[in-house]
């Protein structure tokens, strides 16, 4: 301090830096947004939201306490599994695997919540999240999709519980919301022949063709019934596709995640991602069973034709394996043909540029963190950002979560920065189609 008295410019600079440090520190603690230095990629992961356990935006604290006393809300029983982003809404889904889940489809306002652990607001309202209210309420929702026509595609599987405790309270029903009005514009109940006694549908992909908003198809993966249900918006009709590639790999049922060794040998088709439109006017659906380390693909030209889809075994393509730590949950592909896929064995997200052959040498890890990313359950690309939901699902299901620790996170990373310097970075070629690149 004595020395600095004779150097006023140095002293001023020091004070400036010190005050800046205090402002940054204070801002971080107020906002609740923390950066996680990723082990891979130039851009750090940003922890946008985090929770020890989930909470809901009741009208007042008295209502919340009444719900807790009645057992309608049990904070430790909520596990978030799916996310979606539309404008200033961040949607979060929570299946009713246990008692005390007040709402299965929820959102966070990105306008009013800049970080921290915000309470979830039921979407579109409390009344339409009533369990067992078939036709008027949502019972259990897993993953969802918002399309460019401002529609939110929501499959209500109608179940309460999980595994041996499952009760089919309502039929499988596809609900499509107009996000500009928060009203359901289409409600479709799956046909009995679309499902079987083992059906478990936890994912949906939505395909928009050249014909605009009416040229829409939804693909729903039946993870335990080993099928794919296709729904046509224009025809207002559904059909089921079966193929042996939807089944699990018997050699890929062993998992080591979050310090737990367990076996999920029955897990079939789960993750799905759609390519950009190819020159033939169709997309490619990439998919993988959860208990597998391999990717598969089929043209949507096959899936969108009910008759053709029943007899096109050889139209389905087998791609190489991702490697020994290649279990993957959700995946998504952006408009340039880059696929992003959650690698649950590695607490990471990987990438593949589909203009290159599908092989480990053409894949990279772009986000990884051994604390923040235990079991990445969902992934989306929106507005130039990669959004990742992590939820420690195996610990929740097979052990006990520590509710003094952060268990659930929503993380983001800028796509361009995440891909920079990797084999997935943009190539000078234009996306045309995938078949030629698979065969190279």
Can you annotate each of these PLM segments?
Residues 79, 108-167, 185-192:
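Blade-loop segments of beta-propeller domains
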Residues 33-104, 142-143:
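Beta-strand-rich domains and repeat architectures in extracellular enzymes and scaffolds
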Residues 45-72, 116-136, 183-199, 238-264, ...:
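Surface-exposed loop and turn segments in beta-propeller and other repeat-based domains
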Residues 95-97, 157, 221-225, 233, ...:
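Short loop/turn segments immediately following the C-termini of beta-strands
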Residues 293, 377-440:
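Blade-level signature of beta-propeller repeat domains, shared across WD40, Kelch, NHL, RCC1
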Residues 74-87, 132-155, 193-218, 247-284, ...:
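Beta-rich, blade/repeat-based domains predominating
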């Amino acid at each position: 301090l004595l020395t600095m008295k004779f150097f006023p410019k140095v002293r001023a600079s020091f004070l400036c830096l010190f005050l800046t440090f205090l402002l940054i520190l204070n801002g971080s603690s107020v906002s609740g947004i923390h950066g996680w230095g990723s082990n891979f990629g130039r851009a750090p992961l940003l922890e946008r939201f985090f929770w020890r356990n989930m909470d809901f935006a009741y009208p007042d604290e008295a209502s919340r306490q009444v719900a807790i006393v009645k057992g309608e809300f049990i904070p430790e029983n909520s596990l978030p599994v799916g996310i979606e982003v539309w404008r200033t809404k961040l949607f979060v889904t929570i299946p009713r695997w246990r008692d005390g889940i007040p709402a299965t489809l929820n959102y966070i306002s990105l306008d009013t919540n800049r970080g921290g652990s915000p309470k979830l607001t039921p979407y579109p309202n409390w009344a339409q999240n009533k369990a067992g209210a078939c036709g008027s309420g949502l019972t259990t929702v897993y993953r969802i999709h918002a399309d460019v026509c401002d529609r939110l595609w929501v499959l209500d599987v109608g179940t309460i519980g999980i595994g041996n405790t499952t009760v089919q309270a309502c039929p499988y029903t596809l609900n499509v919301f107009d996000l500009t009005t928060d009203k359901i514009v289409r409600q479709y109940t799956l046909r009995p022949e679309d499902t079987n006694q083992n059906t478990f549908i936890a994912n949906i992909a939505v395909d928009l063709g050249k014909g605009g908003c009416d040229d829409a198809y939804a693909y729903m993966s039946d993870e335990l019934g080993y099928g794919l249900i296709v729904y046509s918006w224009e025809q207002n009709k559904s059909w089921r596709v079966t193929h042996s590639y939807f089944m699990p790999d018997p050699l890929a049922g062993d998992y080591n995640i979050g310090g737990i060794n367990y076996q999920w040998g029955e897990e079939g088709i789960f993750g799905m991602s759609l390519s950009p439109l190819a020159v033939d006017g169709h997309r490619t659906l990439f998919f993988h069973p959860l208990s597998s380390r391999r990717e598969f693909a089929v043209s949507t030209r096959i899936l969108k034709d009910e008759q053709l889809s029943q007899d096109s075994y050889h139209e389905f393509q087998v791609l190489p394996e991702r490697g020994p730590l290649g279990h993957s949950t959700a995946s998504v592909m952006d408009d340039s043909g880059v696929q992003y896929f959650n690698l649950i064995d590695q607490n990471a997200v990987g990438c593949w540029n589909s203009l290159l052959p599908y092989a480990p040498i053409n894949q990279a890890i772009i986000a990884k963190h051994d604390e923040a990313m235990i079991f990445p359950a969902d992934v989306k690309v929106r507005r130039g950002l990669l959004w990742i939901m992590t939820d420690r699902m195996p610990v929740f299901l097979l052990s006990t979560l520590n509710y003094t620790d952060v268990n659930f996170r929503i993380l983001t990373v800028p796509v361009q920065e995440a891909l920079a310097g990797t084999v997935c970075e943009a190539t000078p070629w234009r996306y045309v189609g995938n078949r030629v690149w698979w065969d190279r």
